C-alpha cells in the first residue's frame, strides 16, 4: 500500500454534509486494510481565486495509506460528487502524522485566545 495526501474542497452551501463525506471516505480507505494517518477539517476558508463564482469553500485534508483500487474509488467519488468543487491527490514517500502548519497555527491561536480570556 502507498501513502497519499488528499485535499478536497466542498461547496460552502454543503458544509453540513462534510462529516458524512469524511466518514464515507475514511470507510472506503479502511475497508481493505488501509489507514487514515491524519484527518483535518480546516473549515470554511477564503479561496485564492473564484471557482465557479464561489469565493469560499470548506477544506478537508487527509493523509491515508491505501491501495490503488481504493484511491481510484475515492477519485471517482470526488469527480461525480457535485458538492466537491476541487480535489488534489499527492503521492507521499511515508505516512505524515504531525499536524499541518495550518492546524498548528489554529491551535496556537486557540491557546493564546484562552489565555487572554482568563486574564
UniProtKB/Swiss-Prot annotation:
It comes from the Bacteria. One of its GO terms (molecular function) is structural constituent of ribosome. SUPFAM superfamilies: Ribosomal protein S6. InterPro entries: Ribosomal_bS6, Ribosomal_bS6_CS, Ribosomal_bS6_sf, Ribosomal_S6_plastid/chlpt, Transl_elong_EF1B/ribsomal_bS6. PROSITE patterns: RIBOSOMAL_S6. One of its GO terms (biological process) is translation. Residues 96-119 are annotated as: Disordered. Keywords: Ribonucleoprotein, Ribosomal protein, RNA-binding, rRNA-binding. GO terms for cellular component: cytosolic small ribosomal subunit. Pfam families: Ribosomal_S6. Belongs to the bacterial ribosomal protein bS6 family. Binds together with bS18 to 16S ribosomal RNA. This is Small ribosomal subunit protein bS6.
